[in-house]
Amino acid sequence: MSEQGSYDIQQVLKALPHRYPLLLVDRVKSMDLGERIHAVKGVTMNEEFFQGHFPGAPIMPGVLQVEAMAQAAAILGIETLELAGTGKLVFFMGIENAKFRKPVTPGCLLDLEVEFTQKRSRVYKFRGKASVEGVTTSEAEFTAMIADPPA
């Protein structure tokens, strides 16, 4: 498949329906359509979840790292299938083998690397890894489907 250059936040917003406070992809660094994506999330102290996770020792929840990987996967799926702007949504169906390795704290640049592992009709499987400065912070496999938004 073809290699795509980086996507700024405006292109991310066109591909994803997510908005603040749950938009967890800031930029796409590279994408090989139909294969893989490398996106990033700048983690700042301004994130709402740091108010309660944990006061005095802020750590990004692992489930939000998985959500960030899923959003990167959604961009990959939407762009691969040329569905940006059609209103189609990517819905999470399952998470498997999630592992949380290292904490992510304010000031980190979270790298999100996701690849397709299986493609069938409207159901897709992905493998993702989140890392900071080359150190894996979390990883997971997940299943998603592409569908019309709920009526």
From Swiss-Prot:
Pfam families: FabA. Keywords: Cytoplasm, Lipid A biosynthesis, Lipid biosynthesis, Lipid metabolism, Lyase. The active site is at H53. It is found in: Cytoplasm. It catalyses: a (3R)-hydroxyacyl-[ACP] = a (2E)-enoyl-[ACP] + H2O. Its EC number is 4.2.1.59. One of its GO terms (biological process) is lipid A biosynthetic process. It comes from the Bacteria. One of its GO terms (molecular function) is (3R)-hydroxyacyl-[acyl-carrier-protein] dehydratase activity. GO terms for cellular component: cytoplasm; membrane. Involved in unsaturated fatty acids biosynthesis. Catalyzes the dehydration of short chain beta-hydroxyacyl-ACPs and long chain saturated and unsaturated beta-hydroxyacyl-ACPs. Belongs to the thioester dehydratase family. FabZ subfamily. PANTHER family: 3-HYDROXYACYL-[ACYL-CARRIER-PROTEIN] DEHYDRATASE. This is 3-hydroxyacyl-[acyl-carrier-protein] dehydratase FabZ. It comes from Erythrobacter litoralis (strain HTCC2594). The lineage of its organism: Bacteria, Pseudomonadati, Pseudomonadota, Alphaproteobacteria, Sphingomonadales.
